[in-house]
A protein has these predicted regions:
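Phosphate-coordination loops involved in phosphoryl transfer and adenosine-cofactor binding
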Residues: 35-37, 105, 156
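A generic alpha-to-beta junction signature in SAM-dependent methyltransferases
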Residues: 33, 100, 124-125
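Structural detector of well-ordered beta-strand residues that form the stable sheet scaffold
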Residues: 2, 40, 64, 129-131, ...
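Short amphipathic alpha-helix with an adjacent loop that forms part of the alpha/beta core around
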Residues: 91-102
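Redox-cofactor binding/interface segments in oxidoreductases and associated redox assembly factors
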Residues: 41, 86, 110, 131-132
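Glycine-rich phosphate-binding loop and adjacent beta-alpha segment
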Residues: 115-182
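Short SAM/SAH-binding signature in class I
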Residues: 103-109, 128-129
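Mid-domain Rossmann-like dinucleotide-binding core that forms the NAD(H)/NADP(H) cofactor-binding site
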Residues: 13-90
Length: 183
């Protein structure tokens, strides 16, 4: 249980807590985002994505967001994205590279997975932090993400998974999630 500020009713508090908590853990706790850095948020118009855009902007980051329609791109801008890219109309990775003058992004909050994760590696800055925060592209797509060790090593890139649902890995089975045993 958490204390709720008086300005929130219970429904608003519940709707606020999850997306902003996930965004905070992804960007700040795991991603180490600092003021002045550039962050890429995939799925910037969704619940966690829009929270990540707002949080990153509030922390003083330059924010690039991707979304899948003109209306969603505009929504990302209204949430504070400095640059919003419609991933369905072209090569979003080229647009990110241009926007960063080929330097890349310091932190990426990947809420999509799969091929998006693979392409995100193209736009990571040296020493960047790639946060695998969701899989709106489908959980099966996660297994198709081409994370090449050479790219990670030579780019000095950190890759981390972010999952808030269960703090204790031993509790996964109790929640109906069955992990593949490690051999």
């Amino acid at each position: 249980a958490f204390e709720c500020p008086d300005r929130f009713d219970d429904h608003s508090a519940a709707a606020f807590y999850f997306p902003f908590h996930v965004a905070y853990v992804s960007l700040v706790e795991r991603g180490g985002l600092k003021a002045g850095e550039t962050v890429l948020v995939h799925g910037g118009a969704g619940g966690v994505g829009s929270a990540a855009v707002q949080l990153a902007k509030a922390l003083g980051a330059r924010v690039i967001a991707t979304a899948g329609s003109p209306a969603k791109v505009e929504f990302c801008r209204s949430m504070g994205a400095d640059i919003a890219i419609n991933y369905s109309t072209g090569d979003w990775a080229d647009e990110v590279a241009q926007a960063t003058e080929n330097r890349g992004v310091d932190v990426a909050c990947d809420l999509v997975g799969g091929e998006v994760t693979t392409e995100t590696m193209r736009v990571m800055a040296y020493g960047g932090r790639l946060m695998l925060t969701g899989f709106s592209g489908g959980i099966e797509a996660e297994d198709e993400a081409g994370l090449l060790p050479r790219s990670i090593i030579f780019g000095n890139i950190s890759v981390a998974g972010v999952l808030l649902a269960y703090g204790d890995p031993n509790a996964f089975g109790l929640a109906g999630i069955h992990l593949v045993p490690r051999e």
